[in-house]
């Protein structure tokens, strides 16, 4: 693994083990990142098994070529540089119409956070960027400097759940009328100055929720996850499984709702039985999310908000 792409994988064994790996199966890592889940999954595959790994960050793929070299050499892994919202079309283009399992590790990866110039972190001074795919045009700079007051309030409330959304949007509007807002430090200071003294005393960085909101907007993270998870459930073979790690309430709520819709059925009252074509296609493997162990929490601070949900295809 390259030194500039260090990443501690969260819920490593739980996420992969819950897929109930078949040695000759076809699997997908929808969020390659530091390749931790991919490496562990590949270690359980036989010579006829295969892994397709998605990431829209070329650096992640370059790193994985090094970390997973022995599996690259045996032809057991295929890397796909694309947003996982294009999961189905990419796999079908490669002749894959059915998979035995898929895992997701949602949100931004540690290497992206740690790479200062990517502009994801409110802890380091950097240009406002926040693109997971550096080839796309929309950046955090565009959101902060061109979105209307009402659009800023909308995304701050919806994606950041910050009760000071209106005050922050108004302050951004005032500052950018005088000059453009170019850096993460400038934005973090604006956010901080928009909050009450009482709020600033609370635990956690005052800019965290707003940075999350802008990042989700720039990358359409929830829209992409929604589309991809639905495609994944359609691609699963019977008895195939899907594991999803989330890191904040919006991701977890979305995953929980998608799994619920696929594992329950609404039928007209008085119907004596549920016809086969109305039966749910999925079942929940775990009713409540799996959380990191105390040992993992002590070893990896990023694991604190992680939740793992798993579902299985039943028809």
Swiss-Prot record:
NCBIfam families: 16S rRNA (cytosine(1402)-N(4))-methyltransferase RsmH. This is Ribosomal RNA small subunit methyltransferase H. Its main location: cytoplasm. It is an enzyme of class 2 (transferase). Belongs to the methyltransferase superfamily. RsmH family. It is found in: Cytoplasm. GO terms for biological process: rRNA base methylation. The keyword Transit peptide does not apply. GO terms for molecular function: rRNA (cytosine-N4-)-methyltransferase activity. Specifically methylates the N4 position of cytidine in position 1402 (C1402) of 16S rRNA. Gene3D superfamilies: Putative methyltransferase TM0872, insert domain, Vaccinia Virus protein VP39. S-adenosyl-L-methionine binds at residues 35-37, 55, 84, 105, 112. It comes from the Bacteria. It comes from Streptococcus agalactiae serotype V (strain ATCC BAA-611 / 2603 V/R). The keyword Methyltransferase applies. One of its GO terms (cellular component) is cytoplasm. It catalyses: cytidine(1402) in 16S rRNA + S-adenosyl-L-methionine = N(4)-methylcytidine(1402) in 16S rRNA + S-adenosyl-L-homocysteine + H(+). Its EC number is 2.1.1.199. Keywords: Cytoplasm, Methyltransferase, rRNA processing, S-adenosyl-L-methionine, Transferase.
């Amino acid at each position: 693994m390259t030194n500039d792409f260090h990443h501690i994988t969260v819920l490593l064994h739980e996420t992969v083990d819950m897929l109930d790996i078949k040695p000759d199966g076809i699997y997908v890592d929808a969020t390659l990142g530091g390749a931790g889940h991919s490496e562990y999954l590949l270690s359980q595959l036989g010579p006829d098994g295969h892994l397709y790994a998605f990431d829209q960050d070329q650096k992640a793929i370059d790193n994985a070529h090094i970390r997973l070299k022995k599996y690259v050499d045996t032809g057991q892994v295929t890397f796909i540089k694309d947003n996982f919202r294009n999961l189905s079309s990419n796999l079908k283009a490669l002749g894959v119409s059915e998979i035995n399992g898929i895992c997701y590790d949602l949100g931004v990866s540690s290497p992206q956070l740690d790479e200062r110039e990517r502009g994801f972190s409110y802890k380091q001074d950097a240009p406002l960027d926040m693109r997971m795919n550096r080839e796309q045009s929309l950046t955090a700079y565009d959101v902060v400097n061109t979105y209307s007051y009402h659009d800023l309030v909308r995304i701050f409330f919806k994606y950041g759940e910050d009760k000071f959304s209106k005050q922050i949007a108004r302050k951004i509007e005032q500052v950018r009328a005088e000059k453009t807002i170019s850096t993460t430090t400038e934005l973090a200071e604006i956010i901080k100055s928009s909050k009450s003294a009482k709020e600033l005393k609370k635990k956690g960085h005052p800019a965290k929720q707003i940075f999350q909101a802008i990042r989700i907007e720039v990358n359409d993270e929830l829209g992409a996850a929604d589309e991809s998870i639905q495609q994944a459930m359609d691609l699963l073979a019977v008895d195939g499984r899907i594991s999803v790690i989330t890191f904040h309430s919006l991701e977890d709520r979305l995953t929980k709702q998608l799994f619920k819709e696929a594992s329950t059925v609404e039928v007209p009252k008085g119907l004596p039985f549920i016809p086969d074509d109305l039966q749910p296609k999925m079942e929940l493997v775990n009713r409540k999310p799996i959380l990191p162990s105390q040992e993992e929490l002590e070893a990896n601070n990023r694991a604190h908000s992680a939740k793992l949900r798993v579902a299985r295809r039943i028809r």
